[in-house]
């Protein structure tokens, strides 16, 4: 049974959970099943971790505490379907550290089955989560009915609380620390290696600190302080808010011992997942006892202290409150060597810890607590991880997001010693390598501007990671510790790409990860920080491109009233205005809206921009998943990357947002993501069936195709194309296939599909041309009498559509749907234009063109004389030409078996993307791309079940995910003799009057181009 705890003092000390396996010692009498040998046992209120009491155990040398009852141990599921393991969980309090260990023994009818040691060389609370079958010595057995805790060969006293004899837990997350260093020994998860990495040693030698280095340390400290703190005033309202929040924790001292409301990390609730009905992973946060709010308050107090006058009563009060909170949280186990049993993703909970301690460095020094605080920060920031020279480029995006601030704070907390200098050199090198382009699907940044987390381009995680990366690049800029030009330029290119695919600030829907809610945005401040960090080569004090990008982005209402998602870094408007003013005073001006074309091979994304609009295509492949689904996140977005094409637009002079582009969540039919070819399912069937499929992953779904061909080409950064072989995963409708292409030529986007097929006889297959929300009177009036005219359609947002095939218009006022996270019903007024391929189609196809920012007159003229003609549209290739633009666009799904139509390009020796632009009578621009990332070659690495169906497996289980993109040679044969200036990636194989043969070496899904001359 769960005992609810509300945010008021009377409830904050309530026992969290009651269960027969859980001992919290809240009754006045000792439980009858507990006895002692050479021990004194009692219930104590001196220290407590759950409720207000704990078990006090005073022992003689080798004394024993015995608990006799069924321990409820359960073996692991022999079928392998349930991956959880039985764990023993306990919290121990020690007043006097001893360099010794107690032994936990688990017996069945008096016979010892399993055991583990627990070190007691600490003061305060420590926890252990120990899996019986993986972490303990011996062999646990079902029916074990006794727990013994054996004292060391010395007397002492411990307090025990929150003891759970056995409960099934996610076996990935238990964490080793100084007390239980053997737990989960095989893990390499970057959240869980605090103990292992605390043992790392430096490879950079200690050297004396020179005067110049001492000056740089002061500069770094000033820059960091300015980064995390802006001088202000302490208002009476702020002081009163702090007092109220502080009082909730009921911190008191008695006989030199501190106590107060117990504080946990959010993941501690995972102990109860299999113990209580309606378990909520955020229950501790809702109960007001999670440490994120605690550290946020500590930071708030630190800021108030720094904002108050020296010697003032408020300053003295804030100092007292901070030190009391410091003592209490240290006592609660936030200390060197402690991991609370389960610590995964703790970085989000302790974010306020680092700036809070750093801002109170002088106070901690005066109180004699600075060394202890330094060690605490270095432990949780895993600062020793920076010691060894990185073996390769890249680090996890979470490290940039949650560890950079902590690591630099833990280092800058130190006095100016050779050890501090050694840490700074190691840290700047770690940042440098972390910012460089990472291989394969590794985090964080890609050579093409992609920003990776969860093995895909993921802007929602990138905004947090870029906060750390940009701040650290700025911090070290123009010092002897500055990052390399490659590292600096890579992060700059990521930001330039992000401001290209976002419009104006918002992520495209298909690039929103598991948050398709229209709220995710880039962070203009990242551009500001990079602007004042100077140029990548270190020669310029300002970066002009970053400055002008920032001034364009910040001119939007970037801090609007709507609630920003939790994952977005918080930035003050005052800070934005301050840097904007500085840049303008230095002569910088906002850039115009970006124009051109961008292809992200490491995102399976193509973007075309003209005027203020953008068109964003996204697909998926055997390397890059289609959508990420969690329980309660993105329940219906299965088709987000099934060849989608979103038009982001607004009337001239207005800021582009999802709303101005005709999108809202209310009433949106998740089957009809624009551009996709999909089976139109009832929402119950479209809803993700989220599973825990292996030990490498949690409860999540990220499905892959078995096709390598998916991605885009960009010619001269102005035009491009995109192609994909669509093959849905067998988990749902594995017979569904299509060949899809988009051709981006100036202000025209031509969309082609062929070979659409599946065997689903129950529901129709559709290609969605548009689905738009109708939200105001003008839009309702527009659609009242508008049903299109034959091949020409104009929507109410100024986008024109040329549809030479049969299409169906739907006006659903209202249209019902569901929220992506809760599944709650929504409704809104929507219009859709779709191509219906019928049920179980075979050899289905479509053709249409989109002209954003146009008018009906232009569209009518276009329909009479389209600016393109399709030369081939079948399983092998989609080829079209635009005579007025002198462009021929090739999406070659298969190796051509005969001469290609279109003139210049006669054949290629493999599938690829090609674009040819005739620049003059005897000059041609030729662009070639191979969208296959070639992280491995040969057939797709599928595993099949007994029925021959592709099994669902997590991306994290694949051995090739960190491989470099392989080089794929692409040989093209051109009609006639052409002169080519060879490059490292393009060589002439042969040439004569009839033909010229070139070989391109393609990798990274990149586009390679050469100029041909007669």
Swiss-Prot record:
The record marks 514 as: Transition state stabilizer. It catalyses: Exolytic removal of Delta(4)-unsaturated disaccharide residues from the non-reducing ends of both polymeric chondroitin/dermatan sulfates and their oligosaccharide fragments. Keywords: Calcium, Carbohydrate metabolism, Lyase, Metal-binding, Periplasm, Signal. The gene is chonabc. The keyword Cell membrane does not apply. InterPro entries: Chondroitin_ABC_lyase, Chondroitin_lyas, Chondroitinase_ABC_I, Gal_mutarotase_sf_dom, Galactose-bd-like_sf, GH-type_carb-bd, Lyase_8-like_C, Lyase_8_central_dom. It comes from Bacteroides thetaiotaomicron. GO terms for biological process: carbohydrate metabolic process; dermatan sulfate proteoglycan catabolic process; glycosaminoglycan catabolic process. It is found in: Periplasm. Specific activity for chondroitin sulfate substrates increases moderately (2-fold) while an increase of 25-fold is observed for dermatan sulfate as substrate upon addition of Ca(2+) or Mg(2+) ions. Increasing the concentration of Na(+), K(+) or Cs(+) chloride from 0 to 0.1 M, increases the activity against all substrates. Further increases in salt concentration reduces the activity dramatically, with 50% inhibition occurring at 0.15 M and nearly complete inhibition at 0.4 M salt. GO terms for cellular component: extracellular region; periplasmic space. This is Chondroitin sulfate ABC exolyase. Changing residue 172 to A: Loss of activity against all substrates. It is an enzyme of class 4 (lyase).
